[in-house]
Amino acid sequence: MNKTNPTIALVAGEVSGDILGAGLIRQLKAHYPNARFIGIAGTRMLAEGCKTLVDMEELSVMGLAEILKHLPRLLKIRKNVIQTMLQEKPDVYIGIDAPDFNLDVELKLKANGIKTIHYVSPSVWAWRQNRIHKIAKATHQVLAFLPFEKAFYDKFNVPCRFIGHTMADAIPLKPNRAEACQMLQIDPAQRYLAILVGSRGSEVEFLAEPFLKTALLLKEQFPDLQLLVPLVNEKRRIQFESIKAKIAPNLDLHLIDGNARQAMIAADATLLASGTAALEAMLCKSPMVVGYRMKPLTYFLAKRLVKTDYISLPNLLANEMLVPEMIQEECTPELLAEKLSAYLSDDESAVKNRLVLIQHFTDLHQKIQCNADKQAAQAVIDLLEGKENV
């Protein structure tokens, strides 16, 4: 490797990966001003100077049916990436998330003497744990957002570096509620519940009804309660409004385009589906209840495949049931309302419990606030310069 102008390959498959890639390139340019960046990039990585082989949107498909439909195209892109990388011989290949695409590329490149890093651990600690053996063969190092992920890799002697979470860097330890209310143009003197029904169509389909019925029950108990419903895009908004028209046509809601983070910062409590939103709610210091429903067969299989005691990231990070998880049969309006009312109540004990929970959230936030972009760049530099065990 030329120490001053390495060729660094990065492949991102969706917007979240493009954000990570752009932050990583920015930090790497500070160390290697003449580095060359190639791969598959979105608009943010392109703005940082990465040359892309194809439009990143070509990789951005979700759901099994959609993947099968586009499989020939995805396989062609993967073959093209492998051929290009074997010709270009980059000093390192960084697969950013998209494990179903990137791990096969990494496997081929590592076998041909190219250094590889997988940025963002697949949820191998939770399910399909046998993937760890493929990851070990495919990568020189995994960059993990969360400390329990590194602990899992350590058990299998797979090189892994905990770098902290970029979201923990982006959200302040003490979020500004007044500022969030101003951005949303809502009255900070009111009491708010944020309702996040998920970003996927299937989540909205299964969760909109119990979440709306929960809101109706809570409005009876807290008549002044205001409801904030951020929706990720127009498609999900139309889907949600259609369900609301049947379930709760007269329920007054603040429907918000995007801005889930501001809604959670402004809210006194949050009702949400599991996933990254639960981590974001924790970082926003919003007491939450996690509700999740899926098809009975999917749940039957998931129960047998998932190897963790909890499904939400705050509980996994704390290794205890910090926030209620109401899954499948327990995801009922009555139980959800009961758990949320404990956060919304003005009782002295409820206020105290809320403060204790927020302190727990703050402690966990500090654990994963490590300047992840810089840590990721340092891991790449160490691998390039032969110091990966430092």
From Swiss-Prot:
What the entry lists under InterPro entries is as follows: Glyco_trans_19
Q: Which GO terms describe its biological process?
A: lipid A biosynthetic process
Q: Which Gene Ontology terms cover its molecular function?
A: lipid-A-disaccharide synthase activity; phospholipid binding
Task: Report whether Transport shows up as a keyword of the record.
Answer: no
What are the coiled-coil residue ranges?
A: none
Going by the UniProt record, its keywords in alphabetical order are: Glycosyltransferase, Lipid A biosynthesis, Lipid biosynthesis, Lipid metabolism, Transferase
Q: What is its EC number?
A: 2.4.1.182
Q: Does the keyword Acetylation apply?
A: no
Q: GO cellular component annotations, sorted alphabetically? A: membrane
Q: What class of enzyme is it?
A: transferase
**Catalytic reaction(s) noted:** a lipid X + a UDP-2-N,3-O-bis[(3R)-3-hydroxyacyl]-alpha-D-glucosamine = a lipid A disaccharide + UDP + H(+)
Which SUPFAM superfamilies did the record assign? UDP-Glycosyltransferase/glycogen phosphorylase
Q: Name one Pfam family in it.
A: LpxB
Pathway-wise, it operates in: Bacterial outer membrane biogenesis; LPS lipid A biosynthesis
The record describes the protein's role as: Condensation of UDP-2,3-diacylglucosamine and 2,3-diacylglucosamine-1-phosphate to form lipid A disaccharide, a precursor of lipid A, a phosphorylated glycolipid that anchors the lipopolysaccharide to the outer membrane of the cell.
Hey, which family's this protein in?
A: Belongs to the LpxB family.
This chain belongs to the protein called: Lipid-A-disaccharide synthase
